[in-house]
Regions:
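Glycine-rich phosphate/diphosphate-binding loop of Rossmann-like nucleotide-binding domains
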Residues: 1-40
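Short, ordered loop/turn segments at secondary-structure junctions
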Residues: 9-10, 66-67, 101-105
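N-terminal beta-loop-helix "entrance" segment that forms/cooperates
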Residues: 35-51
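Short beta-strand segments at enzyme active-site cores
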Residues: 36, 60-64, 96-102
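Short, active-site-adjacent cap segments at secondary-structure transitions
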Residues: 44, 68-69, 104-109
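Glycine-rich phosphate-binding loop
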Residues: 47-86
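C-terminal binding/interaction regions
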Residues: 75, 80-125
Length: 125
C-alpha cells in the first residue's frame, strides 16, 4: 500500500508530530508513505487529496489537521464541508482516505492527547 498524506499547516508543530505518528503506523504495516503535501489548512485538503489520488502510484491517502473551537460556527461548517468532500473523493477515486482531523470544536487542552490516536487511526482506516 502506497499512501499519500495531506497535512494542514495551520497548527504546524502539532501536525508535524501527527505526521510522524502516521509514518510510524504505516511502517508498522509495511506500507510506504509515497508523498506528503502541506496545505494552509483543512479546507484546502480536498483539492490536494484529489490531485494525489489521480496518481496511479497512490493507493490511498490520509488527511491530518486540527480544527479548533472558535467564537463562531465557522470551524463546524468547515469540518462538515471537508468531511463531505473526503467521502466524495473516496467514492470518486475508489481509494480509501483516512480522516485524521482533530475537531471541529477542539479545545486547546484536547489537542495534545488526540495527536497520536487520531494520526494512527487515520492510517488504519
Amino acid at each position: 500500500m502506497r499512501l499519500g498524506i495531506v497535512c494542514g499547516s495551520f497548527h504546524r508543530d502539532e501536525v508535524e508530530r501527527m505526521l510522524e505518528y502516521a509514518r510510524d503506523e504505516a511502517a508498522s504495516k509495511n506500507w510506504e508513505v509515497a508523498d506528503v503535501a502541506w496545505v494552509p489548512g483543512s479546507m484546502e485538503a480536498p483539492l490536494a487529496l484529489d490531485r494525489m489520488l489521480h496518481r496511479d502510484e497512490i493507493d490511498g491517502a490520509v488527511v491530518l489537521g486540527i480544527i479548533e473551537r472558535g467564537e463562531t460556527d465557522h470551524g463546524l461548517v468547515m469540518g462538515q464541508s471537508v468531511t463531505k468532500a473526503v467521502i466524495e473523493l473516496q467514492i470518486t477515486h475508489n481509494k480509501p482516505i483516512g480522516l485524521g482531523i482533530i475537531g471541529p470544536g477542539a479545545e486547546p487542552e484536547h489537542i495534545e492527547p488526540r495527536l497520536e490516536p487520531h494520526a494512527r487511526a487515520a492510517v488504519g482506516a
